[in-house]
């Protein structure tokens, strides 16, 4: 078909035509795909929430698929309007034995709250999850750890709603109740335990980082940030305006590189817990300056203080009440809370659903106010 000289030349000079053909094919598909996206639209469209002045990178980008998707746990949320007392009704503390919290409620409202708690925490087991298999005469006994823990969690919930209004109701009345964390589960998701050191072959700082763990958000950052910053009132600030700082790292006034990495680990955890980026709270031009932060920074600061109090005053002291299978895998420590325990990846838990409107009994440590 071809001249002999042409066939001989091809035989003497073999050329791989498949490589260029594949390259041209890939480039052609890429050009076609780009043209289709421009003409039809990006299938993974995003929207940006502006958090500061234009042109400064102050925005939080979200995929519309995520932004418009409802929190699937909202559909299962149980609520019931309170029964307005008419006055003169017998109170729960006078009817039942060993009612240490919620004793000032009427019988109807007391049982209404108890019913809700079973739906929020143990919908399959119901009352027996805390009170056991006995009859009503045995409900006053504290034989099960679940009842002892539930009592303390009611007190914690009341404290949060009453004393941390600046965080839980920062933008509107939202509040918290048992379902905010539990979402129908016996044990809330996104609790955490101490796990450091994460290696046995090293000691010192190397033993708490460079291992992907849930507490490091699967990064090489330190895994002890929650342990340091969410159980103790340790200062988080590590920024210094000096290029060279006189002093010895780990002195009170001198932050070490390790502490800086712990801060990054904590901030990364914050971002993942709320599904946001750094400039949701910080100003892109001056991360270090509270005077230039967004309003969300103050809300987050209060949230951190609130979580520390929750862990110190309510959760960690319950360690002796839990059975072995409820304690941490490394140190047998009590389960602890953090931002994601409530937020579950959303800026607002349950996307801002008001979960306290029907439950004034959980909004205060005093007698509830019915409206």
Curated annotation (Swiss-Prot):
GO molecular function (one): iron ion binding
Organism: Roseobacter denitrificans (strain ATCC 33942 / OCh 114) (Erythrobacter sp. (strain OCh 114))
Residue positions binding heme 3: 267, 278, 281-282
Any Pfam family the entry gives: CytoC_RC
Keywords: Electron transport, Heme, Iron, Membrane, Metal-binding, Photosynthesis, Reaction center, Repeat, Transport
PTM notes: Binds 4 heme groups per subunit.
Compartments it resides in: Cellular chromatophore membrane
Positions with a binding annotation for heme 2: 153, 178, 181-182
Taxonomic superkingdom: Bacteria
Keyword Transferase: no
Gene designation: pufC
Biological process according to GO: photosynthesis, light reaction
Binding site for heme 1: 114, 127, 130-131
Assembly: Component of the photosynthetic reaction center composed of protein subunits L (PufL), M (PufM), H (PuhA) and cytochrome C (PufC). The reaction center interacts with light-harvesting antenna complex LH1.
Binding site for heme 4: 167, 339, 342-343
CDD domains named among the record's database cross-references: CytoC_RC
Task of the protein: The reaction center of purple bacteria contains a tightly bound cytochrome molecule which re-reduces the photo oxidized primary electron donor.
Protein name per its UniProtKB record: Photosynthetic reaction center cytochrome c subunit
GO CC terms, sorted: plasma membrane light-harvesting complex; plasma membrane-derived chromatophore membrane
